[in-house]
Every structure is written in structure tokens, then in C-alpha cells.
């Protein structure tokens, strides 16, 4: 899906967008053309290989620190699997760089007029507070609540959060 950007274009300084000599983004070491529109995010770098072994073909493999990436096709659909490492800090770095790969023209260092929307799917482990959910059960979450405060640093936090769900969770847990 393409989303039209109504803002004026500013040049993003090198201190805010670090591009490596090979044209890749700083932490992930990916170039824009190596990114699929569907991205599976896993925490553990070892899980990247577990997911990618189901790909029909592999277009690229890129590894830097805890960030391992494979882009290929699964059932004819192009997708990327990326390890984020542990913690919200690493996830923030990963998602910020994915957005830059999708929506910044690296040559002039400006946001693209037409926005590219990525589909991010988090695949990993989780805890649960419901007694009927047992260790090893498979779950599909439609929403989540973060208590790390990260979204407070982003414009429009309340527009993307389910405030009713947050309030109900706090009330239920006594936080």
C-alpha cells in the first residue's frame, strides 16, 4: 500500500541516518532492495534459519551483530525474516531502520513522497496471565501492552494504543 506524504521534504542529517559505504543502513546492514514488504521479526538470531529453511529460494543473507536477515520467497510470496535480539531497545533500532529502508531515499537523504507500508509479524515466546494458557501453548495476539515507556517518545502514541485495554489490564493486575 502506498501512502501519500503531505509534508515538505527535509534532508536527514548523517547523524540521524547512518548509511554504510556499501549503501546499507548502519545496524541491519541491509540495502533497500533487500527488504520485502512482509517482515517476520524474531528475537533469537538462531530462529532466522529455522524460518528461512521453509523458503523456496533465498535472495540474500545478511548478518551484523545480533541482526541476522534472510529475504526470500515462501509459497510464492517475497518476505524477510529478521532477528532483533533481546529487548525493546533492539526492537526500536530494528523497526526504525526498517522504516528508513522502506521510506527514505538514501541518495538525497529525504523521505519518499510515496510511503511504503510494511507488514511486521512478531514470532516468538511470550508469557501469559490466564490460568488456562499452559507452557507450550500456541497463541495468536491481536494486540499487546508495553510497559517500557518507549511509545511515549513517539508522536501520536494515543492514536495507536488501545487505552481501554491498557486501563483494563492495569485494573486487573493491580499495577
PLM region descriptions:
Residues 2-175:
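Metabolite-binding pocket within alpha/beta catalytic cores that recognizes anionic/polar moieties
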